């Protein structure tokens, strides 16, 4: 029986290279969300059933799979990578929310939620669903987990429809999750 060495597996989990495409796409989404003045979406009286279902149930599927798949495959390195990316995403999202709360760009306060609350930018829900889907696609297989891709825009639309975030905030949130995957995840060796 192999001895599990925590420090060794942690060091193995640190990526040797980065996906330049994923990093460029994520930084582009963050900059787009922060600097483009998207129009305010009018308040909705009702939320479509698909978005209600996504907000309360479906958005958890990628997050559960991002932990379950490494466990099922006994992929300790993948488990460390999803943990590192999740911790980094949570920290980066909440630090950015506080840093941008009182920043105004194009006569729009980035921290102002559509209903008047604070800590709008970036969306934590969008960052976590983006992280989970991007992790599964980068670590294991784009083709195998392509079916999860629609959950990203559905989660983003649900947050907008529920008047919880602006369009820019959900785009920046998606970029934040993808950025952390790009920095902390490498494809699994098929050997």
Curated annotation (Swiss-Prot):
SUPFAM superfamilies attached to this UniProt entry:
Acid phosphatase/Vanadium-dependent haloperoxidase (SSF48317)
Instruction: Write out the transmembrane intervals.
Output: 22-42, 60-80, 117-137, 145-162, 164-184
Naming one, the record's GO cellular component terms include: plasma membrane
Cell location:
Cell inner membrane
What would you give as a GO molecular function for this chain, any one? Answer: phosphatase activity
Q: Which family does it belong to?
A: Belongs to the lipid A LpxE 1-phosphatase family.
Q: What else is known?
A: In this organism most lipid A is tetraacylated without a phosphate group at the 4'-position and a phosphoethanolamine residue at the 1-position.
Its annotated function is as follows: Removes the 1-phosphate group from tetra- and probably hexaacylated lipid A species. Absence of the 1-phosphate group renders the bacteria partially resistant to host-derived cationic antimicrobial peptides (CAMP), allowing it to camouflage itself from the host innate immune response, and plays a role in the long-term colonization of the host's stomach.
**What name does the UniProt record give this protein?**
Lipid A 1-phosphatase
